[in-house]
Amino acid sequence: MPQVLMGNTRLHAPLEDGIPLIENDENSSQNEVDLYDYVSMSSYGGDNDFLISSAGGNITPENRPSFSAHVVLFAISALVIKPVCCFIFLNHYVITGSYDFAVAGGVCTVLYYMRLALTAWFMFRNIQSDMLPLNVWQQFVIGCMALGRTVAFMVVSYTTLFIRSELFFSMLAPNAGREYITPIIAHKLMPLISVRSAVCLVIISTAVYAADAICDTIGFTLPRMWMCILMRSSSVKRS
């Protein structure tokens, strides 16, 4: 009589009345072990493991991980642009005693580095727990930090540049080009700097820092908002 193995039982072919006979067979456990060994060993194809290796996969160069320009721009922004702008703001504070840009730039920069550290900590904990790098509330907190620092710096910059207008008066003064001051770090090649040049550097640094902050905020929030819109629209279509 033909037999079929199912678990620890042996299923006989149906009889004439259509009712199969099932009998226990303790010796069938050895057959199960042999079957498991066969399945495990069949996953290996010579030197390639088809279950855990992508050696046999045909991945095009466009889909392979690459060192993108975004990484370079991020390094320039975090390690060059922000420190240089803060240095110019500090130099302006030492020269004029006006601390608006120095405080705003310093606080926003410290908040930026805190946001990077918090993001890295969130990602480390989540990946360690086998979860997505950032969940919803973590993305909300990081997005609020990015948006808050940008708005704060923009408000301080607008108030200082266009409402008080002290910088423009200092730059357009008749003697501004002939008055020289000592920069915060004096050098043999540049022992003195004119007031007009110092004010121009502050205005340029303010514009660069504001543009960098806006791009940083857009780069974090816009892709996530767009993905949320796409997911919601796809769920509405399915329903």
From Swiss-Prot:
Q: Which family does it belong to?
A: Belongs to the alphaherpesvirinae UL20 family.
- Origin species, per record, is Equine herpesvirus 1 (strain V592) (EHV-1)
Report the subcellular localization: Virion; Host cell membrane; Host endosome membrane; Host Golgi apparatus membrane
Task: Write down the InterPro entries for this protein, in alphabetical order.
Answer: Herpes_UL20 (IPR007629)
Record key words, sorted:
Host cell membrane, Host endosome, Host Golgi apparatus, Host membrane, Host nucleus, Membrane, Transmembrane, Transmembrane helix, Virion
The task this protein performs is described as: Plays an essential role in egress of virus particles from the nucleus, cytoplasmic envelopment and virus-induced cell fusion. Forms a functional protein complex with gK and this interaction is absolutely essential for their coordinate intracellular transport, gK glycosylation, expression on host cell surface, and function. Together, they modulate gB-mediated virus-induced cell fusion and virion egress and therefore actively participate in these processes.
Q: What is this protein called?
A: Protein UL20 homolog
Pfam families xref list: Herpes_UL20
GO cellular component, alphabetical, reads: host cell endosome membrane; host cell Golgi membrane; host cell nuclear membrane; host cell plasma membrane; membrane; virion component
| Topological type in the membrane | Multi-pass membrane protein
In the record, biological process GO terms are: viral life cycle
Q: Which domain of life is it from?
A: Viruses
State which residue ranges cross the membrane: 73-95, 102-124, 139-161, 198-220
Its assembly, as annotated, is:
Interacts with gK (via N-terminus); this interaction plays a role in the coordinate transport of UL20 and gK to the trans-Golgi network (TGN), and is required for their cell surface expression. Interacts with gB.
